[in-house]
């Protein structure tokens, strides 16, 4: 079942801002999604930024009668995970790109569909640190051939993001790599 195009908020990695996610946001907007940038300047982790992000998220989520999807690159993916922990009823799904989700100890599993897109060629975040516990319901790890700095412009990453966003969370199935995409 294909769901209607819903709201998506895209979060950049550490030290980056909205300019770094323009390719992702443009691709999703061209598919009919209502895409929201993070709108908080450069991602420099501070308590003030965490508070501002939570406010920004609530501002975006309250515009819709349904939960919004979160797409986070690197540290932005960790933020997306934390937002979904804090307000799961407002989050439709979480998609992370090369995000440091574990340091030997997994983050708590989310109640929403969670896809970690990772690459063994990342070179910034160890691919093993990007993995979610895929034994949990509606959690998966999808490997791509990319580097950390090109995850946001890699066509194979966009294939995964688009596929995951199209899925009805109640009819979730693991991503199936198209034959020509490879891993």
Task: Spell out what each predicted region is.
Residues 4-19, 23, 27-119:
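Serine-dependent carboxylesterase/thioesterase catalytic core
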